[in-house]
Amino acid sequence: MRKKNKFLCEICFEYQDMFYLLRDKLSCTNAAKHTIQLEPGVTPINTRPYRLPESQKEEIDRQVKQLVVDGIVTPSESPWNSPLLIVPKRAGLEGQPKWTMVVDFRKLKKKTIGDAHPLPDITEIMDQLGQSKYFTCLDMAMGYHQIELEHGDGPKTAFSTKQGHWEYLRLPFGLKTAPATFQKMMNSVLSRLTGTCCFVYLDDIVLYARSLAEHDAKLREILDRLRTYKLKLQPEKCQFLRKEVTYLGHQITNAGVRLDPQKVAKIERFPTPTNPRELKAFWGMVSYY
């Protein structure tokens, strides 16, 4: 335990610039840019904003203000507009409820040309992890927002609040080809490491090793790669030097891989669907496995 704590202290000190902390300004990677390629003949789509409770509007204004400070969105004069939603997410360490602002890009997605780049096969990843002894999981800080949009594509992402009209400078969540762009970037950043000492699925990285020496050397190599490309990590979501980790809904140890019991319990507690919407939600949850 003492050796582990010493190692973690060394890593946190040596790579302190890698961790995104409260009130930090999120950096922008030099590894990729995102392009929104539209079908021929598409004209700007302008959808009326959804009606939202006043309390949610205040939360949206707070989040947009922070996005402006971080250089993620900017005031816009775009003819495009997609409506906003705000959805709950898991409470933070303080136990306070949190909300995520989401732009509904469904109409834009229908007019966007797709990208056939595949995501990794989760089953194949799990098949190769069970024989290792030491693991570290790394989570990218607001992953998509670390990628710039190509010049001229920002207006397509425009949205409105009671404070004004805005557009993204960085890659937002919900665009059709965002996962492909992010996965291609991470595959490039960690080239020749994926499949030998780590796997990456979008913004989630798992390092696996059979010895402490191998683990420590490979972790530094991965962190050096991320630093080179100006990519930041979310410290509270990282799991360092563990013999058991939770990754992509699975618990991984040197004894093998099993489904995360918390995810299984959630499925078991899910009420019997009574309409198509509930059935779709249930199917989306179980089909992951």
Name every feature range the model reports, one short phrase each.
Residues 1-289:
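Retroelement reverse transcriptase polymerase core
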